[in-house]
A protein has these predicted regions:
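Conserved N-terminal helical subregion
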Residues: 5, 22, 49-165, 170-183, ...
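Conserved mid-domain beta->alpha element of the FAD-binding
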Residues: 6-24, 152-153, 180, 236-238, ...
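Conserved Rossmann-like nucleotide-cofactor binding loop
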Residues: 13, 37, 158
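Glycine-rich FAD pyrophosphate-binding loop
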Residues: 22-42
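Conserved N-terminal glycine-rich FAD pyrophosphate-binding loop of Rossmann-like flavoproteins
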Residues: 37-55
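Acidic/histidine metal-binding catalytic segments
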Residues: 67-68, 119, 244-260, 316-322
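Conserved FAD/dinucleotide-binding core of flavoprotein oxidoreductases
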Residues: 85-99, 103-109, 187-262
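C-terminal auxiliary extensions adjacent to catalytic cores
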Residues: 358-380
C-alpha cells in the first residue's frame, strides 16, 4: 500500500520534495497551498550553490533553458563601493553542478511544470491536526479533510501551521533590518561587475547585486533599522530618499528606484522545533529562517527536501526525530556563518572596517579557510 503524504505550502522546499516523491511509486501525495495560485511573475532572485544544484539536476534542472539562469564565476567584495578582493566560485563547481542564479519564479515554474496539476489544492488554510490510529487527520477551514501517513509543513517564514500543531506561538523574530529590491538591465550596471555577484559593505548596511538571467540583475539593499524607522520606510517616497542616501547610490540606479520598489522586514527563527506529533516534518523556512547574509535560503530548502525524501524511504520508525537531528546540525553550521556575515558586513567604525578589509583580503587567498568556511556549505 502506498504511503500518503500531505505537503502544506507550494514553495521551493515543498515542490522539490514533491518532485522527488513523484518518481517513487511507494508514495501518494497532495500539495495544499493557501494562495489562489503560484506566484510566477515575481522577480526575486535566488542563489543556488552546488549543494542544491546537484539535487535539482536529479529532476532535470541541467536541462533548463539557459536564458533563464546565470552561472556567475566570482564573488566580488567592496567596501563603500571600492573593490577589496574577489573569490573564485568555480572552485566549488563539479561538471554540470555550477553555482547558479535565477529568478525565484523561474525556479518555481521549473518545479511546478514537472508535477501533475491534479495534486495541487489551492485556497486551503489548515484548521486542525490530530492523530487517529497512526494516521494524521488534517482539516481545512473550508471543511475539507484528509488522512495521511506523513505531514510536511512547508508554508514559509510565517508558518501558522507549526504554531497550530505545537499549540504555541512560533512567530519569527524581527531582526532590526529591512530589505529593498529592484531589478535593472545588466548593460546598465556600471560600477559593479554585472556578470558576477557583488557585495558592497557599508555602515550598518550592505548591497548585493548579481545577474538572475542573461539580461537582468537583481539588486538587494539591506539596512539596519529600528521599529520606528521601519514603519516610516513603509512610505515609498521616504523610502526612495532614504536608500539613495544610505547606500550612496550612483546615478545609474536612479531610474530604477521608483514606485515599484519592493521592500520587506527581515525575520529569523528562535530555534528549530521537534514536532510533538510523529511523522510531522517542518521544511524550509518553516523549520528555520536564516538571515540572508549567506544566500542559502532556497538552497537549504532544497537540501532539506532531499534529506527528508531519503529518510521517508528508510525503515527507521522515528523518522521525525531522525530528520530533525540531521537538519538541526546542518542548520547550526549555516546559521553561525550567516550571523557572522551579517555582523561583519555592517561595520561602521573606521578602524574595524580597515581591519575587516585587510583580514578579508588575506583569508580569501587561504584555500584551507575558504574550503572550511564556504566549502562545507556549498558542497554537502
Amino acid at each position: 500500500m502506498k504511503n500518503k503524504i500531505a505537503i502544506i505550502g507550494a514553495g521551493v522546499g515543498g515542490l522539490t520534495l514533491a518532485n522527488l516523491l513523484g518518481k517513487d511509486p511507494n508514495f501518494e501525495l497532495m500539495i495544499y497551498e493557501r494562495e489562489e495560485t503560484l506566484r510566477l511573475d515575481e522577480g526575486f532572485g535566488v542563489q543556488l550553490a552546488v549543494n542544491s544544484v546537484s539535487i535539482l539536476n536529479e529532476i532535470g534542472f541541467d536541462k533548463i533553458n539557459q536564458t533563464e539562469i546565470f552561472n556567475p564565476q566570482r564573488l566580488e567584495f567592496y567596501s563603500n563601493d571600492k573593490r577589496i578582493c574577489g573569490l573564485d566560485l568555480t572552485q566549488f563547481n563539479i561538471d554540470s553542478e555550477k553555482y547558479t542564479t535565477l529568478k525565484r519564479s523561474a525556479l518555481l515554474k521549473f518545479l511546478k511544470d514537472k508535477l501533475f496539476s491534479n495534486i495541487f489544492r489551492f485556497n486551503k488554510s489548515l484548521e486542525k491536526v490530530e492523530t487517529i490510529n497512526d494516521k494524521i487527520k488534517i482539516k481545512f477551514t473550508d471543511g475539507i479533510e484528509d488522512e495521511v501517513d506523513y505531514l510536511v509543513v512547508s508554508d514559509g517564514v510565517f508558518s501558522k501551521t507549526k504554531s497550530l500543531i505545537e499549540g504555541k506561538d512560533y512567530s519569527p523574530i524581527y531582526i532590526g533590518s529591512k530589505a529593498f529590491r529592484i531589478t535593472m538591465p545588466k548593460d546598465k550596471v556600471k560600477i559593479f561587475d554585472s556578470n558576477n555577484i557583488n557585495i558592497s559593505m557599508k555602515p550598518n548596511a550592505h548591497l548585493v547585486i548579481y545577474p538572475i538571467n542573461q539580461k537582468t540583475c537583481n539588486v538587494v539593499m539591506i539596512t539596519r533599522c529600528n521599529t520606528a524607522l521601519s514603519k516610516k520606510l513603509e512610505d515609498i517616497t521616504f523610502a526612495k530618499s532614504f536608500i539613495k542616501k544610505t547606500f550612496n547610490l550612483s546615478s545609474e540606479f536612479d531610474e530604477y528606484i521608483n514606485d515599484d520598489l519592493k521592500h520587506w522586514s527581515l525575520y529569523s527563527s528562535k530555534n528549530p522545533v521537534l514536532p510533538k506529533i510523529n511523522n510531522v516534518f517542518y521544511l524550509g523556512d518553516a523549520f528555520y529562517t536564516f538571515l540572508p547574509s549567506m544566500a542559502q535560503g532556497a538552497a537549504q530548502s532544497i537540501e532539506a527536501a532531499k534529506e527528508l525524501f531519503e529518510i521517508l524511504n528508510n525503515t527507521n520508525k522515528n523518522k521525525s526525530e531522525e530528520y530533525f537531528n540531521q537538519r538541526a546540525e546542518r542548520t547550526k553550521l549555516i546559521n553561525s556563518r550567516s550571523n557572522f556575515n551579517y555582523f561583519a558586513f555592517h561595520f561602521s567604525n573606521t578602524l574595524f572596517v580597515y581591519f575587516r578589509n585587510l583580514i578579508l583580503k588575506r583569508l580569501i587567498k587561504n584555500s584551507k579557510f575558504v574550503d572550511s568556511y564556504l566549502g562545507r556549505v556549498f558542497r554537502k
